[in-house]
Amino acid sequence: MRITVNVDGTSYTDEVEPRTLLVH
């Protein structure tokens, strides 16, 4: 699963497991 996260104007694209999203 590829996600793009925008933090403080900086974009991070990473391959993460679905469970990782639940931590936030």
UniProtKB/Swiss-Prot annotation:
Its EC number is 1.2.99.-. It is an enzyme of class 1 (oxidoreductase). Heterotrimer composed of an alpha, a beta and a gamma chain. GO terms for molecular function: oxidoreductase activity. The keyword Oxidoreductase applies. Keywords: Oxidoreductase. The lineage of its organism: Bacteria, Bacillati, Actinomycetota, Actinomycetes, Pseudonocardiales. This is Formate ester dehydrogenase gamma chain.
